[in-house]
Amino acid sequence: MTEKLGILAIGHGSKLPYNKEVVSQIADYIAQKHSDVVVRAGFMENSEPTLEEAIAGFAGTGVTKIAAVPVFLASGVHITKDIPGILSLDEKGCGILNIDGKDVPLCYAKPLGADELIADLVFKRVQEAL
């Protein structure tokens, strides 16, 4: 059986539209660059789709495994407690989702964190500001 990857891009959410737009655009960029991957965006609060709704969006796609990645810079309560609770993750950051009547393994990725790519982007924004 061929593996089909799903990616759940998790955003914080906001009452203002820009947070949803940024996370959704990042999810779209991933989907455009990796056309063989099914990408969905979901949000913790104040934005839709919720995480549960985004997970339901994998129905009918044939995904055989899902990676959930928080589009956050650093760990906090949402990353360490709330999201793992919503996704019913074990202590290793793994879980099982039922999609189309099948058990689909889910793995939880780290937040973006300190990375040279982030540093390059920060420097790019500085150059744009000057």
Swiss-Prot record:
The keyword Transmembrane helix does not apply. Gene3D superfamilies: 3.40.50.1400. One of its GO terms (molecular function) is cobalt ion binding. GO terms for biological process: anaerobic cobalamin biosynthetic process; methanogenesis. Ni(2+) binds at H12, H78. Co(2+) binds at H12, H78. CDD domains: CbiX_SirB_N. Its EC number is 4.99.1.3, 4.99.1.11. It catalyses: Co-sirohydrochlorin + 2 H(+) = sirohydrochlorin + Co(2+); Ni-sirohydrochlorin + 2 H(+) = sirohydrochlorin + Ni(2+). Substrate binds at E48, L73, A74, S75, G76, V77, H78. Keywords: Cobalamin biosynthesis, Cobalt, Lyase, Metal-binding, Methanogenesis, Nickel. SUPFAM superfamilies: Chelatase. The active site is at H12 (proton acceptor). It comes from the Archaea. Pfam families: CbiX. Pathway: Cofactor biosynthesis; adenosylcobalamin biosynthesis; cob(II)yrinate a,c-diamide from sirohydrochlorin (anaerobic route): step 1/10. The keyword Metal-binding applies. Belongs to the CbiX family. CbiXS subfamily. Homotetramer; dimer of dimers. Catalyzes the insertion of Co(2+) into sirohydrochlorin as part of the anaerobic pathway to cobalamin biosynthesis (Potential). Involved in the biosynthesis of the unique nickel-containing tetrapyrrole coenzyme F430, the prosthetic group of methyl-coenzyme M reductase (MCR), which plays a key role in methanogenesis and anaerobic methane oxidation. Catalyzes the insertion of Ni(2+) into sirohydrochlorin to yield Ni-sirohydrochlorin. This is Sirohydrochlorin cobaltochelatase. It comes from Methanosarcina acetivorans (strain ATCC 35395 / DSM 2834 / JCM 12185 / C2A). The gene is cbiX.
